[in-house]
């Protein structure tokens, strides 16, 4: 087994539990801390890619299982320190006691959001929207972060990104020609993704068409029916499939986007 991989794992575990942000830490600092730890996992993945032909199949499997374990630990910490916001109505509904009760009242608690703040484009609760570079007040040569959630039937195309985080999207088209860092996707379904990035992470997603260029091994977990158009040298890793035979959860099709 790679000695460097072993040392990286020890160092990662030490940093993971000795420097975990406290409840008083700001949300932005927590997000930065999580992004740094995710990059560290990427370094471990690169190390495994470089030595995979030099180590025994059993050792490679053990290393992959350890990567899966570390990823799950980080996900659990992410859940603990950045829990989802509790559901709240935006405005209270007051009914006088003399009034008759009104049936079938629907209150829209999730207002659409499109705004730019601290070099980050925030998108949330959108349906049938087209979002492009025109919403960014910077010239195209400056990279921005993208954070998006709860999208339905949207087309999102941003030319230059430093990182992208997508959560909970259905029947969308995403295009990110340049991502300097990582793209993290979770709960994405029935969508198309075109992306060039340094690091690709996909979790809990189904039925995707992915046109991908990536400088490190793409990683998927708890996902299925993923079709990749992918020709880079780094193998796609499925952290939920530790067997030696190919994962049934994804396929590589070179002509995926020719139709």
Swiss-Prot record:
It is found in: Cytoplasm, Cytoskeleton. InterPro entries: C-CAP_CF_C-like (IPR017901), CAP/MinC_C (IPR016098), CARP_motif (IPR006599), TBCC (IPR027684), TBCC_N_sf (IPR038397), Tubulin-bd_cofactor_C_dom (IPR012945). Tubulin-folding protein; involved in the final step of the tubulin folding pathway. Transmembrane segments: none annotated. Belongs to the TBCC family. The gene is cin2. This is Tubulin-specific chaperone C. Keywords: Chaperone, Cytoplasm, Cytoskeleton, Microtubule. GO terms for molecular function: GTPase activator activity. GO terms for cellular component: cytoplasm; microtubule; tubulin folding cofactor complex.
